[in-house]
């Protein structure tokens, strides 16, 4: 059996997969420092690549021959952080179907006791492939190459506060053009943007909960080039006593929106 040549964000975050005798695929992600956000809380965004890759793969394997798929929407709802001592997470996927435009799969992130800690949903569109679409289907399982560090460090993400925007505090993040954060087409991996958006979007709020945020909702408008640093900007849409909502965007060099996300945070300030 040939060895995998994949060196993307999945192995960088420790994600691995295995093929089961019944044709299904099992995913595993270790619970380590990549689930720590800059404030020291459990980082909800640490689940984003697992959800994007695990659920997106279910859509991808059902695409028409000769086509490639790209994530257009990703939804992640946190139920609770893994129990103390939990060592790994998996995903249970339920493919819902194809409406003629998008393939849709929902699923649950479970800990090593089988307890559900989050739910997710991924929609993808297919398009004429600019790569060897069928060749990637034969990619063998890759070994974990877990990069040490917190989620921001693994994502090569630095944060800075830029003062008040129209709705309040603004936080900006910069993702360095690290090649292992790319998708097979060479652009920023959708799960990486989702993870970074959650980190930056949650950083505009202070609260007492032990998780960074409760929900992440992402729309991908166009490819996010990774030939230079990627800038991610979060600003407040609502900052109440019990919960808040931030909007996170990234733009290309022409100022066009590439992706937009909302991050929802519950917890009293």
Region locations from a protein language model:
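Non-catalytic linker/capping segments at the edges of enzyme domains
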Residues: 1-34, 122-180
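Residue-level preference for beta-strand/loop junctions
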Residues: 9, 21-23, 68-70, 87, ...
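Hot-dog-fold acyl-thioester-processing enzymes
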Residues: 9-12, 23-59, 172-202
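Intrinsic-disorder/low-complexity, polar/charged segments enriched in Ser/Thr/Lys/Arg/Asp/Glu/Gln
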Residues: 24-26, 73, 88-90, 104, ...
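Preference for bulky hydrophobic residues occupying beta-strand positions
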Residues: 29, 76-77, 107, 173-175, ...
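Hydrophobic beta-strand-centered segment that forms part of the acyl-chain substrate-binding groove
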Residues: 39-42, 55-90, 201-231
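HotDog/MaoC-like acyl-thioester-processing domains
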Residues: 57, 80-90, 94-146, 224-227, ...
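Structured core of small recognition/catalytic domains
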Residues: 172-242, 246-257
């Amino acid at each position: 059996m040939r060895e995998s040549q994949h060196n993307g964000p999945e192995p960088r975050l420790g994600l691995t997969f295995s093929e089961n005798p019944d044709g299904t695929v099992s995913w595993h992600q270790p619970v380590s420092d990549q689930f720590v956000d800059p404030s020291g809380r459990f980082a909800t965004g640490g689940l984003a690549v697992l959800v994007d890759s695990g659920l997106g793969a279910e859509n991808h394997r059902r695409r028409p021959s000769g086509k490639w798929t790209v994530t257009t929407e990703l939804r992640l709802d946190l139920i609770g952080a893994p129990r103390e001592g939990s060592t790994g997470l998996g995903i249970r996927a339920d493919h819902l179907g194809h409406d003629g435009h998008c393939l849709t799969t929902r699923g649950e992130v479970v800990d090593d006791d089988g307890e559900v800690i989050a739910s997710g949903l991924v929609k993808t569109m297919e398009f004429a492939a600019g790569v060897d679409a069928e060749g990637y289907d034969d990619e063998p399982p890759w070994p974990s190459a877990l990069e040490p560090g917190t989620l921001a460090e693994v994502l090569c993400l630095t944060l800075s506060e830029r003062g008040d925007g129209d709705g309040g505090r603004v936080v900006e993040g910069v993702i360095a053009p690290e090649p292992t954060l790319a998708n097979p087409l060479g652009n920023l991996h959708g799960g990486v943007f989702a993870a970074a958006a959650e980190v930056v979007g949650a950083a505009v709020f202070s609260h007492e909960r032990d998780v960074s945020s409760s929900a992440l909702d992402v729309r991908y408008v166009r490819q996010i080039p990774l030939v230079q640093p990627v800038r991610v900007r979060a600003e407040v849409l609502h900052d109440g006593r019990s919960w808040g909502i931030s909007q996170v965007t990234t733009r290309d060099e022409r100022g066009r929106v590439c992706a937009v996300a909302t991050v929802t945070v519950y917890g009293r300030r």
